[in-house]
A protein has these predicted regions:
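Basic, flexible linker segments flanking DNA-binding modules
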Residues: 1-10, 15, 99, 153, ...
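An active-site-proximal beta-strand-loop segment
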Residues: 4-39, 44
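Mobile genetic element proteins and their domesticated derivatives, centered on retroelements
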Residues: 11, 30, 36, 55, ...
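Active-site beta-loop-alpha junctions of metal-dependent nucleic acid enzymes
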Residues: 23, 40-62
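Short small-residue beta-strand/loop micro-motif enriched in glycine and branched aliphatics
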Residues: 35-41, 93-95, 119-120
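Acidic/histidine-rich, metal-coordinating catalytic segments
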Residues: 46, 62-78, 150-155
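RNase H-like two-metal-ion nuclease catalytic core shared by retroviral integrases
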Residues: 70-72, 76-85, 92-115, 127-131, ...
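C-terminal domain-tail junction helix/linker
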Residues: 88, 112-185
């Protein structure tokens, strides 16, 4: 997608378990298809209301997307989810079962979470884990350079929205370089 909030991809990662616990845990995520900016939360449930709470958080922070892409999980095909999208004039785009690669950006984020958060952090307490994950998401958006957006962070790309209305990398790179200090320099 070439414009911010033209489409977001949503997914649920999990379940995963903490040491010495049978409690299921999940990450519910929403990613802007253009800037790669992520809104994500740790949840002990994966119900439609939890997915909607996260989508509402995304909208409050980033504005309303034109379209939401998701798999066919029951959280995304429920009446309450679809009704929310209709009432808010957000298009609904579900991908066919068995084709997660169609949501490659959110799946790539999930892989990063598995490899750089779950595999690295020793988490024994849900509340502490939620704080750590919140810091991870913040660092992902604000500090982690992204190859798919020319080495800029998702927040740098998203913050350019006030000056630009497109994520066309050929046009945006020069303008971002002029206005933002590149991470790591």
């Amino acid at each position: 997608m070439k414009k911010l909030n033209q489409m977001v991809q949503m997914d649920i990662l999990g379940p995963f378990y903490l040491e010495n616990s049978a409690q299921k845990n999940y990450f519910i995520s929403c990613e802007d298809d253009c800037s790669r900016k992520v809104t994500s939360e740790w949840s002990e449930r994966k119900k439609s209301i939890d997915v909607l709470d996260l989508l509402e958080d995304y909208i409050v922070e980033n504005g309303k997307p034109n379209k939401v892409m998701h798999d066919n999980g029951k959280q995304f095909t429920s009446k309450i989810f679809r009704r929310f999208l209709q009432r808010n004039n957000i298009k609904d785009k579900s991908i066919p079962a068995g084709y997660p690669q169609l949501q490659g950006k959110i799946e790539a984020y999930n892989k990063i979470v598995k490899n750089e958060f779950l595999a690295v952090e020793n988490i024994f307490d849900v509340e502490e884990g939620k704080k750590m994950y919140s810091m991870f998401v913040k660092a992902y958006n604000e500090e982690r350079e992204h190859g798919g957006i020319n080495g800029y962070t998702p927040s740098q790309m998203f913050l350019s929205k006030g000056r630009l209305n497109s994520c066309n990398n050929n046009k945006i790179v020069k303008q971002i370089k002029e206005s933002v200090t590149h991470v790591g320099k």
